Amino acid sequence: MDWWKTAVMIVGIGLTLTACGGAVASGGNGSPDQSGCTVKGAGTASPALTSNVIPDPNTLGRFVPNNMTVKVGQAIEWNWQDPTVPHSVTSDDGTTFDSCLQNKGYKFIVTFTQAGSIPYRCTIHPSMVGTITVTK
């Protein structure tokens, strides 16, 4: 395949994924973590809500709260407080936002730009789930 066809295809895929997202990247370094994961959707806005990523012996972790509602333009911050194992905050589509696996002390802020419902999870703990509802 010619290089220009490949370039056009990559740009098209990028535009498609951008149009489908409900969050905007307004900060963060976008660098890969140790597993090769690249943080997506990280921002620096003042959060309207905060959720804590905490230990739970029954489920290997929890988001508290796990279901949150914000308005378009508002941000949510997740704070890692579990000293025992890493966790991620990852939209189910894997592209809207992804903190990658992080340890205690990490903070992740996402600003939501489109109304809708965005389910999210920890990529290695199936019982750690939540939903962000974004209203106009």
Give residue spans per PLM region:
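Extracytoplasmic copper-binding redox domains, predominantly the cupredoxin/blue-copper superfamily
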Residues: D2-K136
